[in-house]
C-alpha cells in the first residue's frame, strides 16, 4: 500500500510541472550591472540590465555592502536615476571605500543574482558634458581672423572648490565632412581655431574628463557659418620650403657620411699644438742627435753668451833673449840657413785672454793720425834715460793705416807688443799676431842664431836707413821716414843691425814672470828677472810706462823713472787694471 501512495504523488507532481512548462513560466534570468558613475565624487548612480522574467512578474533589488563589513544594505533610491537604476545620495556615499554591489531578480519560479561589482567612487567619476557652448568669429586688426569657442564647466561638478581638476577636448568638422578634427584644450574653457575653409558650415562639440575618471558625453552640437571672404593661410609655400629643407638636410647628411673628417677639418680646423721653432719631433724619436742639432743650428737665432763683457784677468809680456824686436825673416833669409825659433807660451799664463778679438776694439777703430817711430841711438849711454831715446816723427797726413810701420829702438828698453785683431778686408798682407810669443818672434827675430849671424856679418854692409818692411811697403816707408826725420839727421832713421857700441842682444836672458805692481793711476809694472847671475848683479828695470799702441796693434812699454823710485813692498792690486787709455 505504501509503495502505491508514493508513486501516485510523484505522478501528480510531474503533471503539474508539465502544465507549467506548457504555459511558458520559468525562473527569472541573470541580471547584469552596466556601470556606476559619479558626477562629482559626492553622489553616484548604478545602472543594470535585467534578464528574462520567466513569464512571471519579476522583482529586482540592488544590495550592497562595504568591504570589511558583513551588514548588507539595499539601494536607497530606485527612482531618481530612472528605471533599473540605483541612486546613492551624499548620505550613502563614502570616498576611499569599496562597495560590493549585486542585483537580484525574484519571481514565483525562483531567484537569480548578477555578478558582484566592486566600485570605488574616486575612480568612477564621469562628469556631465560642458554647458553653454558658444561659437564666434573674431576679426582682429593686427592679427588673422579666427574662430573663438567658449564653454562652461559641468553644473554638477564643483570645480571652484578644487575638489578635482577637469580637462577639456573639442572636436569640429565641416558639415559635409565625415571625420572630426580634435583639439585638446587642457584646463582652459576657451579655444581659438585658425585656418578654416571659407563658405563652410562647421559643427562643434566639447567634452570633459576629471583627473581620475572617464570622459563625459559630448555636448550637443553647435554650428557656425564661415563667410566666403574669410582669409585662409596658403600652405603651399610652407610645404615647398619644408620639402626643400628636407632635401638639403639629406644632402648634408650624405656628404658628412662620405667625407665627414675632411668637412669637420674644414669647418673646425684643429688647433695646432705648441711647437718649438726648428725642433723636429720625428728626429727626436729616431734618436739621431746629429741631425737634431744640425736642424737647431740652422735657425736664425742670434748667438748667446753668458758673459756680456770679456774681461782680461792676466797680462803677461815676454822679453826673452831668444826673441828680439825685428821682423820675421823672409824666405830670402830662410835660404841662408836661418830658422826662426818658436817659443811656446805657457798655457797657464792667462795669455789666451789676450787673443780676444773684441779686446781694445775701440782703440783699433780710432784713427792714428800721428804714428810714432823709434830709433836706436848711437850712444849707449843714453840707455839711462829711455824717454830721450825715443824720437817721434809725424808721418804725412795722407798716409793710411796700412802705410804706417812701427820702428823700434835697438838699445832702448825691451818692449812688448799687444795683439790686435786685423780686419780681413785689408788688401796688403800683414803678419797676424795671436799671442805675445809671435809678436816677440816677429819683432826680435831669432835669438841665438841671429846674434851669431850678426857677429859674422859685415856691419858696414848694412845700410843705416834699412827698416822693417811689412806687407811689401818698405820702400814707401823708407821715403816717408827720411822725410819725417829731417829734424835729427845725425841719428839712424831705421833699424840697423847690431853695432859695436850697442849690442843687439843682452848677454843674460830676461824673463817677465809676474806683474810687479799696479800703481794707483792704473799703471802696469812688470818685474824682469834674470835666470842666471854672472859677475856683478845687474840693476833691474821696471817697464811700467806704456809709450803707445802702434798701428799694427803693438803695445810698447818703456821704463818709468818715477815708478822705479816707489817702494817694491807695495801690495799689488787685487782687481784687474782698468782699460788702457
From Swiss-Prot:
The keyword Iron does not apply. The chain crosses the membrane at residues 235-258. This is Prolactin receptor. It is found in: Membrane. A motif (WSXWS motif) lies at residues 215-219. GO terms for molecular function: cytokine binding; metal ion binding; peptide hormone binding; prolactin receptor activity. Residues 1-24 form the signal peptide. Residues 259-581 are cytoplasmic. The keyword Transcription regulation does not apply. The gene is PRLR. InterPro entries: FN3_dom, FN3_sf, Growth/epo_recpt_lig-bind, Ig-like_fold, Long_hematopoietin_rcpt_CS, Type-I_Cytokine_Rcpt. Residues 25-234 are extracellular. One of its GO terms (biological process) is positive regulation of cell population proliferation. It is a single-pass type I membrane protein. SMART domains: FN3. Keywords: Disulfide bond, Glycoprotein, Membrane, Metal-binding, Receptor, Repeat, Signal, Transmembrane, Transmembrane helix, Zinc. Residues 329-349 have a biased composition (Basic and acidic residues). Coiled coil: none annotated. A motif (Box 1 motif) lies at residues 267-275. Residues 27-127, 129-229 form the Fibronectin type-III domain. Residues 321-362, 462-502 are annotated as: Disordered. Zn(2+) binds at residues 211-212. Glycans are attached at residues 59, 132, 233. Disulfide bonds join 36-46, 75-86. Interacts with SMARCA1. Interacts with NEK3 and VAV2 and this interaction is prolactin-dependent. Belongs to the type I cytokine receptor family. Type 1 subfamily. It comes from the Eukaryota.
